[in-house]
Structures are given as structure tokens and as C-alpha cells.
A protein has these predicted regions:
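Outer-membrane beta-barrel porins/channels
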Residues: 3, 20, 43-61, 69-274
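Acidic, small-polar-rich N-terminal luminal/periplasmic segments of exported/outer-membrane proteins
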Residues: 4-6, 12
Length: 274
């Protein structure tokens, strides 16, 4: 509808509908509650996972994937320079992800923890071509931070090196974290067909990140009581700490949306996004 500066996110060409200087602040609260029950998983030899990383039978088959409450702030400001030009600035959270299994979970050999946080800053200029058409261009500066944890079963490595270790007794895990700035752009067009109907197109480019940081391998299973096992694993490239990078690309999107005013009290809206 282009009723306030948050139109900068949905279709920044709508800034030309705003008078003077305006600002808006929004706060989204996401409280997921995802659970699993009677989980089963298997070692590479086909036997069922029955041990926790410490080698005990305290393996969890029920649990939560995540229960973190996430607060996502959004803030926008617009300023009308003259009858043709508008400026806008937005700070928003375009993408995020959070998954974490308990470290004793039977599902720990999946990606055990994933945390992705992004925040975008977008300066924008909008131009009113005529009474029916407006266009806009925005530059997106996006900061991303990621944290990953992945468990691994080193039993096969131990056996290949002549050490007798039972399944679940030689667990280790990797922790990787990094951050990066990436850049993209936003293009938009809005067409007032008549006083009652309006359509718009909004394109948001992909943003590529090469998150750089640290990777750490932790060897936690009781099988590492064998003094020969850990040095051989370290020597095979599983360093205690080293530089690491993670490539993440946030997707592009193309939206077509419209509004139709039925009467002074009722509007109908539609949106299709690829």
C-alpha cells in the first residue's frame, strides 16, 4: 500500500507516495517450538546409535531442535527532497536460521548446530517519473554471522590405524564460526493504473558471503584415552584450531504485487514472489 517508510523493503518505488519526512520502527518476535520424538539413527556399519559422545548410554531420543526466541528489528526512514525525488534508508533482518540438537542427541551426526544471523542496511533513491509511474534503486549492504557445529564418528579412522574402538566411543565435533559483509541491489517499479488499481515489481539481488573465521576440532570420546589416537587424527588434518571460511549466498527474489480499492473502506492485495 506504500502507507509508511517500510515500503522500502516491499517496493521502494512506493516512497514517492509519502510526504515530508517519516520514520517507522517494527519489532518481530519469532518463537519456534520444534520437537522430535523416538529418534533413530545409525552408524556407518548399519548398527543403531546407542551411545552419547561420552560413551555412556545416556543418548537422547526425544528433544527439541530449537527453542530460542529471536527478536528481529526493522527500522525505516523516508525524506521527500522535492516533487520528483525521495530518499530512504532501511535497517532490517532479511534472513535468519537457527537449529540446535542436544549434544547427546541420537541425531547429533546431522548438522548439530546452525546459527545464521543477517542484518541489512539499504540506502535508496526513488524517482517519480510522472503521475502514474515511479522507480527506485537501492544498494544493500548485508552483514552475516554464522556458527556451525558438526559431530563426527572417528571409529573407522581408529580401526584403519589398528586401534580397537567400539562405535560411539571416538566422537569428535567441529565448531566453525565466521562473519562477512556482502553487497547487492534492489530495483523497483510502481504503476498507478488508475485511482483504484496499482501494480508493482520488486527485484532483490542475491548477496554472496565468504564468511571467514575459525574452525576448532574437539575430540571428546573415551576412546581418545588411547594416547596414540588423537595425535594421528590431528596429523590427518583435524587441527585443534585453524582458519576457516564458509560460503553462503542469500537468494535473489522477484515480486509482482497489486492493490485494488473496492470502496473507501476495503482494499484487496495480492503478491506473487519467486
Amino acid at each position: 500500500e506504500a502507507a509508511d517508510p517500510s515500503t522500502l523493503f516491499y517496493n521502494p518505488a512506493g516512497l514517492t507516495k509519502l510526504e515530508g519526512t517519516q520514520a517507522t520502527i517494527n519489532l518481530n518476535i519469532v518463537a519456534p517450538n520444534v520437537k522430535y520424538k523416538d529418534g533413530k539413527a545409525y552408524y556407518p556399519d548399519g548398527s543403531e546409535i546407542t551411545r552419547a559422545p561420552d560413551g555412556s548410554a545416556n543418548v537422547e531420543r526425544d528433544g527439541k531442535i530449537t527453542d530460542d526466541v529471536v527478536i528481529a528489528p526493522h527500522g525505516y526512514i523516508s525524506h521527500q527532497v522535492n516533487d520528483k525525488v525521495w530518499l530512504g534508508f532501511g535497517m532490517y533482518v532479511p534472513f535468519g536460521s537457527g537449529t540446535e540438537y542436544d549434544e547427546n542427541s541420537v541425531l547429533r551426526y546431522n548438522l548439530n548446530e546452525l546459527s545464521l544471523r543477517t542484518i541489512a542496511l539499504q540506502p535508496t533513491v526513488a524517482y517519480k517519473v510522472n503521475e502514474q509511474h515511479s522507480v527506485a534503486l537501492g544498494v544493500v549492504a548485508q552483514n552475516s554471522k554464522a556458527k556451525l557445529r558438526q559431530y563426527a564418528n572417528f571409529r573407522a579412522f581408529a580401526v584403519a590405524n589398528g586401534m580397537a574402538v567400539a562405535n560411539g566411543m571416538a566422537d569428535g565435533y567441529a565448531k566453525v564460526h565466521g562473519d562477512d559483509w556482502g553487497f547487492g541491489y534492489n530495483l523497483a517499479w510502481m504503476w498507478d493504473i488508475n485511482e483504484r488499481a496499482r501494480v508493482g515489481v520488486n527485484y532483490r539481488s542475491k548477496v554472496e558471503h565468504n564468511l571467514s573465521g575459525d574452525a576448532e576440532w574437539h575430540l571428546v570420546g573415551p576412546g581418545f584415552a588411547n594416547p596414540a589416537l588423537a595425535p594421528r587424527i590431528r596429523g590427518a588434518g583435524y587441527a585443534e584450531k585453524e582458519d576457516a571460511s564458509v560460503k553462503i549466498t542469500t537468494p535473489e527474489s522477484l515480486s509482482l504485487h497489486g492493490m485494488y480499492k473496492i470502496d473507501p473502506k476495503w482494499n484487496v492485495y495480492g503478491d506473487v514472489t519467486w
